[in-house]
Amino acid sequence: MDIIKWLESWYKLNCDGDWEHSYGVKIETIDNPGWSVKIDLVNTLLENVHIEYSLIESTETDWYGYSIKNSAFNAAGDPTKLLFLIELFKSIVEEYDTVYVSKLLE
């Protein structure tokens, strides 16, 4: 469950007294069945990132999809994919964080 701690830290880092009043993290169940994860990215490092929707469907019961557009990470997956979807978001944050940090060092 370390990924939940990581998400808590990411959320806390972005709470600045204003951001959390309009933006945040939403985790819901969907009727496929499965999970939906929406994470607002306005005023964050990923605000201007765009990733086209990608659906990875191994079987009817083993699937997930995700995108980043309109300053939001949107992902959904089968009932076993909740932690995976959060890990996926973490990997995207870390990828762009590395790019951002390297640009700062130039």
What are the functions of these language-model segments?
Residues 56-102:
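Helix-rich interaction surfaces within compact, conserved domain-sized segments
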Residues 2-6, 22, 34-36, 84:
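Short, well-structured alpha-helical interface segments that form or flank functional binding sites
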Residues 12-16, 32, 90, 94, ...:
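Generic surface-pattern signal
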Residues 1-16:
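Eukaryotic proteins' extreme N-terminal regulatory segments
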Residues 105-106:
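Compositionally biased terminal segments
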Residues 15-54:
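Amphipathic, interaction-prone secondary-structure segments
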